[in-house]
């Protein structure tokens, strides 16, 4: 809306819960500026710089850290990951709603930096189902899967720190729940200043015509 900042939505959840799949479906169905993360890890096969991540070397990343250029950042498995601040701020200033898809610790950092951010935690149906997804994803060793599950259990136990939770059991239901949250937040009365202002506007020329119709129909002034 004109003159209003956009809203910042943050999707997070355990590794393997399906954040990327839900995010892709959500972006197909509603207008959001998706903020691309930056990382020092090398691209995986099929990944494109500026689409999946901004791939940079460690000195470049660390220089941006010193310049306070990240909303959040963290080191994970030897590589740095972060959300560049400038693209997010530009989009919010234009009145665009922004979506981040980041890890749990990063999401909590964002909430501290931007208290009005809306945090949405994606839950697995169960830890056993999460383990099944991690196994069939085929990317991690048994040791790494166990570590991810331990981390996931800690994250789930802290889900109360987030504004909403969505269970990703049936994909389409999870997407519908996520979209419902976006709709509810967009309709909050505190965020609808321009819409409320427009609803109170009077078109004097139109009302004069209507008053004339009433006068002819009923006589008098039409009031």
From Swiss-Prot:
Pfam families assigned to the protein according to its UniProt record, in alphabetical order: Guanylate_kin
EC category: transferase
Gene: gmk
Its EC number(s): 2.7.4.8
Family affiliation: Belongs to the guanylate kinase family.
Residues annotated for ATP binding in this entry: 13-20
GO cellular component, one term: cytosol
UniProt organism field: Thermus thermophilus (strain ATCC 27634 / DSM 579 / HB8)
Function recorded in the entry: Essential for recycling GMP and indirectly, cGMP.
Compartments where found: Cytoplasm
Protein name stated in the entry: Guanylate kinase
PANTHER family for the chain: GUANYLATE KINASE (PTHR23117:SF13), GUANYLATE KINASE-RELATED (PTHR23117)
GO molecular function: ATP binding; guanylate kinase activity
């Amino acid at each position: 809306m004109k003159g209003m900042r956009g809203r910042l939505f943050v999707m997070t959840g355990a590794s393997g819960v399906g954040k990327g799949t839900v995010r892709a479906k959500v972006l197909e169905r509603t207008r959001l500026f998706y903020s691309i993360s930056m990382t020092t890890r090398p691209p995986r096969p099929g990944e494109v710089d500026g689409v999946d991540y901004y791939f940079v070397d460690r000195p470049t990343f660390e220089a941006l850290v010193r310049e306070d250029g990240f909303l959040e950042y963290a080191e994970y498995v030897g590589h740095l990951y972060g959300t560049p601040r400038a693209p997010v701020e530009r989009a919010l200033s234009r009145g665009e709603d922004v979506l981040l898809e980041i890890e749990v610790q990063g999401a909590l950092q964002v909430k501290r930096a931007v208290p009005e951010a809306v945090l949405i935690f994606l839950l697995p149906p169960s830890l056993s189902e999460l383990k099944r997804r991690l196994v069939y994803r085929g990317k991690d060793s048994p040791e790494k899967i166990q570590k991810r599950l331990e981390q996931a259990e800690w994250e789930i136990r802290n889900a109360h720190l987030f504004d909403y939770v969505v269970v990703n059991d049936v994909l389409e239901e999870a997407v519908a729940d996520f979209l419902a949250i976006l709709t509810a937040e967009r309709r909050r009365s505190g965020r609808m200043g321009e819409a409320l202002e427009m609803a109170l506007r009077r078109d004097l020329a139109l009302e004069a015509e209507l008053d004339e119709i009433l006068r002819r129909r009923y006589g008098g002034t039409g009031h």
